[in-house]
């Protein structure tokens, strides 16, 4: 009897355990199914696609009615009104107003920055590689011109300001230092007292002078002056040595005797210090001496020296 009761108790305990396990698994499976269905619903309900009517009402509230940061109560009323035109929640209304305010602030900053740049652009001077550059649309470059100045190409290694000085000088023309084809030709003068001068400034003293041959005019004139002085000295020395060497072998020129048209006479004298001869021409100042027109040659010293 005891063994039979013990077996029945074991069977009941076994059945109870299996039933409880089965119910637990069913409960767990049901909860998992419910969780998965809820997750799918959340994925489908997270994204909000507004309709044209909803966007129109929201913009009207934002721009025309001045609603920028609606309260919770206002959000509920707005969302309830917008549900008539499509699916919408309160959080969608809240985020729409937040995003719209952020975009508007960003747009205002960009517009302010662009306005500031456009205002300061005509007034600012750009410094680039040692060259001051003004606005290219400066009317002075188009209103007044510098005749005789032709500069087709330029670079940005230095600046040369060439302008007209005088009665008709207008402004200055900025030319760069590495001009390859830069020439200055004199313009036509308007009258005898109007003249044109060209001045240059801002030239690098250590730059090559072959680019600007006209800038070396002072040095060129100095060199010409020195060369002219040297040539004059050489000519004077050559003339001196030539006179010293030729004075000893000087021959007497042939002069016509008693010529009526001669108004002067020549006197040949002997120079004892050098051993040579030199001639002296005398022009008659009075009419009587000119009418006489006699040529006197004193050869006494020459005869005495030869004897």
UniProtKB/Swiss-Prot annotation:
Gene3D superfamilies cross-referenced by the UniProt entry: Homeodomain-like
Protein task: Transcription factor that plays a central role during developmental processes such as early embryogenesis and flowering, probably by regulating expression of specific genes. Required to specify stem cell identity in meristems, such as shoot apical meristem (SAM). Acts in parallel with HAM.
GO molecular function terms attached to this record: DNA binding; DNA-binding transcription factor activity
Sequence similarity: Belongs to the WUS homeobox family.
Localization (cell): Nucleus
SUPFAM superfamilies, alphabetized: Homeodomain-like
Name of the molecule in the record: Protein WUSCHEL
Main localization, broad class: nucleus
Tissue expression as described in the entry: In the active shoot meristem, it is specifically expressed in a small cell group underneath the presume position of stem cells.
Taxonomic lineage from the root: Eukaryota, Viridiplantae, Streptophyta, Embryophyta, Tracheophyta
SMART domains: HOX
GO process terms (BP): cell differentiation; flower development; plant organ development
Gene symbol of the encoding locus: WUS
InterPro entries on file: HD (IPR001356), Homeodomain-like_sf (IPR009057), WUSCHEL-like (IPR044555)
